[in-house]
Amino acid sequence: MPPKFDPNEVKFLYLRAVGGEVGASSALAPKIGPLGLSPKKVGEDIAKATKEYKGIKVTVQLRIQNRQATASVVPSASSLVITALKEPVRDRKKEKNVKHSGNIPLDEIFEIARKMQHKSFGKNLASVSKEILGTAQSVGCRVDGKNPHDIIDAINAGEIDVPEN
């Protein structure tokens, strides 16, 4: 016999979803079905929560308590960098392995680093900023018109001052 249902118990599920799209409820069913939730309704909640990250893969945190699911986006560094580029939405089915060729100001990188600081193991904002610059390089964009790695070298050399917080 299964254990008694505790209404105060909180469970967390982490899923990868494409922003603004209702995922296949057949993919959600094995994860959500045993918790007594409707996969279709949860899929719509996820689509609502991720609509500002339209077309970008993001991690979604589902907080499940008393058979109620609340979806919240846990943005990754790459999704924040891609949204900072403000590029038009591309058709995911037609274009694969897209290289982003935009340009981000350095101040925007520092803002993303502040958002990601709680998740990073970096000791200060400079080290977290270097992590974000590395992500920007792998995404394929430029920072202030330069290669992100050149800016990392400039931070290491002390040529660029990084704010404390």
UniProtKB/Swiss-Prot annotation:
Q: Which InterPro entries match?
A: Ribosomal_uL11, Ribosomal_uL11_C, Ribosomal_uL11_C_sf, Ribosomal_uL11_CS, Ribosomal_uL11_N, Ribosomal_uL11_N_sf
Kindly list the places in or outside the cell where this protein is found, as annotated in its UniProt entry: Cytoplasm
Superkingdom as given in the UniProt entry: Eukaryota
Q: Can you list the GO cellular component terms from the UniProt entry?
A: cytosolic large ribosomal subunit
One Pfam family of this chain: Ribosomal_L11_N
Q: Which GO terms describe its molecular function?
A: large ribosomal subunit rRNA binding; structural constituent of ribosome
Keywords, comma-separated and alphabetical: Cytoplasm, Ribonucleoprotein, Ribosomal protein
**Example of a GO biological process term:** translation
Report the main location listed first in the record.
Answer: cytoplasm
Q: Is Cytoplasm included in the keywords of this UniProt record?
A: yes
The record's family statement is:
Belongs to the universal ribosomal protein uL11 family.
Q: What does this protein do?
A: Component of the ribosome, a large ribonucleoprotein complex responsible for the synthesis of proteins in the cell. The small ribosomal subunit (SSU) binds messenger RNAs (mRNAs) and translates the encoded message by selecting cognate aminoacyl-transfer RNA (tRNA) molecules. The large subunit (LSU) contains the ribosomal catalytic site termed the peptidyl transferase center (PTC), which catalyzes the formation of peptide bonds, thereby polymerizing the amino acids delivered by tRNAs into a polypeptide chain.
Q: What is this protein called?
A: Large ribosomal subunit protein uL11
Q: Organism source for this protein?
A: Candida albicans (strain SC5314 / ATCC MYA-2876)
